[in-house]
């Protein structure tokens, strides 16, 4: 029996950040229902190993063991079906561009009216407010905005991203931690809440020592040259 046995998660995440958070919750025992829009669905389905090998590791790695359903959230009938599904859930996981679910009438404020215990977890690139809130982006945008590409590699090299999708994965783990904290809080208060995480925020968290060193010295960190 997993620690999250009996918890239901509705996952409308895309690519890595949202789906990986849903995957971690699934690994901990939660029931996770993957919801995709009709047509292309989660775009991770369309990132193959190569043009010769069309298997999709991005999708498979982040969606193991989930249940799957297609609902068109953009139309009234689909949105109504989705609301009924969310009414049965403990957690909603998403990482659409900020404002997308709100435009479809699926904001936290709307969904929590009929499910006040809902944990509404939203991931983004730059956060829901302020500069960049209306911009889309994925892992490389998070690495670049957070400064990781400027400290990776050796002196004299151009900005170098980390080979793995590290911004996405840190963002997803931060989302998972936020969800678990919100579930604990709900046990105390009986109320759900909205959880917001961003790729940029995750990169700042992961490079706390570099940011602190800058605040202390006013010197921009250079290349790591393979070290820390």
Locate the predicted segments by residue:
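Acyl-CoA thioester-binding alpha/beta core of soluble enzymes
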Residues: 1-39, 83, 88, 95, ...
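A structured beta-alpha segment of the ubiquitous adenosine-cofactor-binding alpha/beta core
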Residues: 54-113
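Glycine-rich phosphate-binding loop and adjoining beta1-alpha1-beta2 segment
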Residues: 27-68
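Acidic, glycine-rich segments within the central catalytic cores of soluble metabolic enzymes
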Residues: 145-228
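Short, hinge-like loop/turn segments at secondary-structure boundaries
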Residues: 49-53, 136-141, 213-214
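N-terminal Rossmann-like NAD(P) cofactor-binding subdomain of oxidoreductases
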Residues: 94-153
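Glycine-rich beta-alpha junction loops
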Residues: 39, 125-127, 199-204
């Amino acid at each position: 029996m997993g620690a999250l046995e009996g918890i239901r998660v509705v996952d409308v995440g895309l690519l890595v950040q949202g789906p990986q958070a849903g995957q971690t919750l699934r690994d901990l025992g939660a029931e996770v229902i993957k919801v995709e829009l009709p047509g292309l669905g989660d775009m991770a389905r369309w990132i193959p190993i190569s043009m010769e090998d069309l298997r999709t590791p991005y999708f498979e790695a982040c969606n193991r063991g989930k249940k799957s359903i297609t609902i068109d959230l953009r139309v009234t009938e689909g949105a109504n079906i989705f609301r009924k599904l969310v009414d049965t859930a403990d957690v909603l996981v998403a990482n659409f561009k900020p404002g997308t679910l709100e435009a479809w009438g699926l904001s936290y404020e709307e969904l929590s009216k009929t499910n006040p215990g809902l944990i509404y977890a939203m991931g983004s690139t730059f956060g829901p407010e302020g500069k960049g809130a209306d911009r889309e982006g994925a892992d490389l945008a998070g690495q670049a905005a957070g400064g990781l590409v400027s400290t990776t590699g050796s002196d004299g090299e151009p900005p170098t991203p980390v080979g793995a999708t590290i911004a996405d994965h840190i963002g997803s783990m931060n989302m998972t931690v936020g969800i678990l904290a919100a579930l604990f809080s709900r046990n105390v208060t009986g109320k759900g809440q909205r959880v917001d995480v961003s790729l940029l925020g995750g990169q700042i968290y992961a490079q706390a020592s570099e940011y602190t060193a800058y605040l202390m010295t006013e010197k921009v960190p250079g290349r790591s040259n393979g070290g820390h």
